[in-house]
């Protein structure tokens, strides 16, 4: 564990971390057992607004989870909507694996197409 990760863990103790992904929530509970992970729904801009304005998150059963102190969201989604400046830290795949198939590209070509196969071999 790097020193920076240990500092992050201490700072997150007792905080509420919001995420919309079940996979991320599971990783967060393992990484930061002293933090409370809450289901945080909505489009990316909506979630950022709820974070900034400390708006309590409504639960499907009608209750409230309170407001979040931090959010874990996909960096590519924030970049796509022009909000990359909101990213304070990128979590490495060593800490939190991306979703299965995320950033995966597959290419098919006929087995007999040697020129295409040679070109594809350079990027494999």
Model-assigned labels for residue ranges:
Residues 30, 34-124:
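Small-molecule-sensing regulatory modules
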Residues 1-35:
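A conserved helix-loop-strand patch within extracytoplasmic ligand-binding domains
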């Amino acid at each position: 564990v790097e020193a920076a990760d240990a500092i992050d863990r201490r700072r997150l103790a007792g905080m509420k971390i919001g995420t919309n992904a079940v996979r991320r929530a599971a990783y967060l509970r393992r990484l930061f057992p002293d933090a409370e992970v809450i289901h945080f729904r909505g489009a990316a801009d909506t979630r950022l607004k709820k974070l900034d304005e400390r708006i309590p998150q409504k639960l499907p059963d009608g209750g409230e989870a309170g407001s979040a102190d931090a959010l874990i969201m996909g960096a590519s989604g924030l970049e796509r909507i022009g909000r990359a400046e909101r990213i304070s830290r990128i979590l490495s795949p060593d800490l939190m694996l991306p979703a299965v198939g995320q950033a995966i590209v597959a290419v098919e070509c006929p087995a007999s197409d040697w020129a295409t196969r040679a070109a594809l071999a350079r990027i494999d």
